[in-house]
Amino acid sequence: MIEVFKTNISNEKLARQFAIQLRNELPGCRVKFDLQDCDKILKVEGSQFIPEKVIEVISMSGFECEVLE
């Protein structure tokens, strides 16, 4: 399963921190940010994960995160 999210994270350091946190929360998932894209893309790939968990982790820190349609 691959899910793509739109975020407002524009800082590389923050993106790295969130990637580490998401990998801990979602074992076995690959997490990658593309901050060059205008939507500040977050891509999560794994066999089983709940997209709402990704949104929760990001939004709990005050950032926006939504599934990109």
Each PLM stretch: what is its role?
Residues F18-L22, V54-G62:
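Short amphipathic alpha-helices in soluble, non-transmembrane regions
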Residues K40-V44:
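A generic structural motif
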Residues G46-P51:
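Helix N-cap motif at beta-to-alpha junctions
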Residues M1-N11:
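Short glycine-/aliphatic-rich beta-strand segments at the starts of folded cytosolic domains
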Residues I9-E25:
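Short amphipathic alpha-helix segments
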Residues L35-D39:
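Short Gly/Ser/Thr- and Asp/Glu-enriched loop/turn motifs at secondary-structure junctions
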Residues K32-F33, G62-E69:
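Conserved short beta-strand edge segments in small beta-sheet-based binding/regulatory domains
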